[in-house]
Regions:
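Cyclic nucleotide-binding regulatory module and flanking cytosolic helices
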Residues: 1-27, 82
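Short, flexible turn/loop "capping" segments at secondary-structure junctions
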Residues: 29-30, 131
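Conserved short-loop catalytic and cofactor-binding motifs
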Residues: 6, 41, 138
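Polybasic "coupling" helices that flank or enter modular domains
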Residues: 94-97, 102-155
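Cyclic nucleotide-binding regulatory domains
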Residues: 35-97
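Conserved hydrophobic/aromatic beta-strand scaffold that supports enzyme active sites
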Residues: 28, 70, 101-103
């Protein structure tokens, strides 16, 4: 879980003892190609960090499958709104290849605030960072061709 620890410490300045306590809340899981991590319509109970592999966030609209997001190594993935509110997921999240993740349940995630006293501030900063990445991807989608987006993302 060293890679999760390094990633977490990039965003959250905490002592090693607190960081180790937070990291211990995550479970390492292996997903096979095509395996669903979160299914649209289910209560969203987990958030994951992608250690290795590629995951796809998608939905079906009018019979057409739509990809909303692709997460690769080093990204966190969930239906954030459903995870935070305890609601039903709007998305299906599927492993596109054999994938390794570190997963944390909603109940364990809520324990982080007891470990890191200023977690609400740190969490807000992290969500802002994630939102900025999303805004940049939307801009790329609007301003680049499909080929340019592919080359930018996978190179």
């Amino acid at each position: 879980m060293q890679d999760l620890k390094e990633q977490f410490s990039t965003y959250f300045d905490t002592g090693d003892d607190k960081l180790d306590s937070v990291i211990s809340l995550f479970d390492k899981k292996h997903l096979n190609k095509g395996q669903v991590f979160i299914r649209q319509g289910d209560i969203c109970k987990d958030l994951a960090f992608v250690k290795q592999g590629i995951m796809r966030v998608s939905t079906v609209i009018n019979g057409k499958e739509i990809t909303q997001w692709i997460a690769t190594k080093g990204y966190y993935i969930t239906d954030l709104a459903a995870f935070i509110t305890g609601g039903r997921s709007r998305w299906t999240i599927t492993a596109l290849n054999n994938t390794t993740i570190y997963s944390i349940s909603k109940s364990d995630y809520e324990q982080i605030g007891k470990i890191i006293p200023d977690w609400n501030i740190k969490e807000k900063q992290f969500i802002t960072h994630c939102f900025t990445i999303l805004e940049n991807r939307v801009l790329q989608f609007l301003s680049m061709t499909a080929e340019e987006r592919y080359l930018h993302y996978f190179n």
